[in-house]
Design a protein with these regions (language model features):
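Alpha/beta catalytic cores of nucleotide-metabolism and tRNA/nucleoside-modifying enzymes
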Residues: 1-18, 23, 29, 129-132, ...
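N-terminal small/glycine-rich loop or linker at the start of catalytic domains
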Residues: 13-16, 51-72, 106, 112-114, ...
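Active-site beta-loop-alpha junctions enriched in small/polar residues
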Residues: 22-24, 48-50, 78-80, 105-107, ...
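Alpha/beta enzyme core
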Residues: 33-36, 86-116, 125-200, 226-229
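Conserved beta-strand positions in the central sheet of alpha/beta enzyme cores
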Residues: 18, 43-44, 74-76, 101, ...
Length: 351
């Protein structure tokens, strides 16, 4: 797919709604589950070391293959060597990925100490060379995910203009500084001035709860009380844990039957893709779907001991049987603070 056709197709889908790259979560099964519920979203994979992909055939063969039903997929890579970034980008392009993204925003101390992630915001010459070398090496779009700045957003505009001039096709900004990491509230107000100065798409990230919240956050008037600048899209991250429905508009709430079906699918996809590592992955992911659910302690204990897909099916069938009166109940209109509280109300009403 050419950059031109990709971006024209993407522009027609405004707003761009994307699954944020999250280490330990955004593997192929997770991306496929998200796309099953919300087919129009874009999914980012977990971020991988550029050096690791180049030097480890095992890693590349494990993480780069992806299925047709999860496309378009974006692979994010981190590192500090422009040559390694270019070589890894070529591998990603050959895998059939839609585009390749550069991590210039991870605030983890180990990452930054190594000269990766957020440290590239203050090692600008290296950052620009990385974008230039990658843009020369591949025909797919090259994008950057960064932060407001190291300590404040004063230099954000200049930094992103240089990234654009170096060849970046899209910029995503997590609306916190490196110093903030994940503390405090994300402040999107600086992103709109950035958007006015760039000719490439700008996506916002940070504290997005769901699709409707994302649409609200990308509008300047939400933050400044006036103004008509609108960002091109948003990312949702941690709010997707156990909740792929967060990508659906109008605060759609799934029925219990729908959630159990997605849990079954997620478990089966993990088994299909990971096999030996399946148990630990399944336990981590599946319990997220039942956070706060009535009787969750018993179900969680059952799920963390499963060893086969059939054992998961047994647990899910047990949940369906014990809550059959609310299997197809549509929870309330959103007045409850969570999906599970809404079910709890239904459960009590049906007793």
């Amino acid at each position: 797919m050419s950059s031109k056709s990709f971006w024209s197709d993407l522009a027609a889908q405004w707003p761009i709604a994307a699954l944020a790259p999250m280490d330990g979560y955004c593997d192929s099964p997770y991306r496929r589950v998200m796309k099953r519920v919300a087919p129009d979203i874009i999914t980012f994979a977990e971020f991988y070391s550029a050096d690791g992909l180049v030097h480890s055939k095992t890693l590349a063969d494990t993480v780069l293959p992806h299925e047709a039903d999860e496309k378009p997929v974006i692979f994010q890579i981190f590192g500090k060597d422009p040559d390694m970034f270019a070589k890894a980008a070529v591998m990603i392009e050959r895998s059939g990925a839609a585009w390749v993204d550069i991590n210039m925003g991870c605030p983890a101390k180990k990452v930054v100490k190594s000269g990766h992630g957020s440290s590239l915001m203050i090692n600008r010459d290296t950052a620009f060379r990385i974008v230039e070398e990658m843009s020369k090496a591949v025909s797919i779009p090259v994008s950057v995910k960064t932060r407001l700045g190291w300590e404040n957003p004063e230099l954000l505009k200049d930094f992103c203009l240089w990234l654009q001039n170096a060849g970046a096709n899209l910029i995503t900004v997590h609306a916190r500084t490196y110093k903030q990491a994940f503390t405090g509230k994300a402040d999107w107000s600086a992103l709109f001035d950035l958007k006015r100065h760039l000719s490439i798409p700008v996506i916002g990230n940070g504290d997005v709860l769901d699709y409707d919240d994302g649409v609200k956050r990308i509008q300047e008037s939400t933050w400044l009380g006036s103004g008509d600048t609108v960002l091109d899209g948003f990312m949702i991250g941690r709010s997707t844990f156990g909740n792929p429905w967060s990508f659906l508009p109008w605060h759609v709430r799934p029925t219990l039957r729908e959630i159990l079906a997605i849990m079954r699918l997620h478990g089966d996809l993990l088994w299909e893709r990971k096999w030996r590592k399946w148990m630990l992955e399944a336990r981590k992911h599946l319990v997220q779907y039942l956070h706060g659910f009535p009787g969750v302690k018993i179900y969680r204990q059952a799920l963390v001991t499963v060893e086969t897909p059939e054992m998961i099916h047994t647990v899910l069938d047990m949940i369906a049987h014990e809550h059959q009166l609310i299997l197809d109940t549509i929870p309330d209109d959103g007045s409850s603070s969570s999906q599970m509280e809404a079910w709890r109300s239904c459960d009590i009403a049906c007793d």
